[in-house]
Amino acid sequence: MKKFFIILIISLPVLVSCELETSDNGDLDGFWHLTTVDTLANAVQTDMVSQKVFWSFQKDLLQLRGSTDSEKELQEFYLRFVLKDDQLLLSDIHLRDREKDDPQVDETTLPLIYIYGIRQLQESFKVLKLNNKEMIIQNNTLRLRFTKM
């Protein structure tokens, strides 16, 4: 019996210290494939399926990665995001480059992220549709359509 209490006393702090992180992102969390980009100014629709461009949401981190139709790897990025009501706010963009400590994107490196549908260092999208299969978001210039993988 004494041995049982010693094990319990030793293991209790370990069990109490564990914390499960949860997310309130609902259907947003997961792996999304960018399928279409609509340019609102001229109503041009660009099919992105062959580009293999992906957005991956988890907790408050967004990962952008993909490859072009010629299988060329795209630059990978990490961003912070906030989903509040029907607004998706993106900020704090970092280029994945471990040798350079994942530098923050600035005006000179911003064009590298354009293929992902992001044109500003701080971007705001209105969420037009979001469920466990499809997401449509829009800002002042673009409408982005995704399917969930």
State what each model feature region is:
Residues 1-4:
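Positively charged n-region of N-terminal signal peptides that target proteins for export
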Residues 6-9:
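Sec-dependent N-terminal signal peptides
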Residues 14-17:
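C-terminal motif of bacterial Sec signal peptides marking the signal peptidase cleavage site
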Residues 19-25:
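Signal peptide cleavage region of secreted peptide precursors
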Residues 27-43:
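Tryptophan-anchored aromatic micro-motifs
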Residues 29-31, 59-63, 130-136:
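Short, hydrophobic/aromatic-rich segments at coil-to-beta transitions
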Residues 38-45, 49, 61-130:
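Contiguous, well-ordered beta-strand patches that form the walls/edges
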Residues 78-86, 130-149:
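Edge beta-strand at a domain terminus
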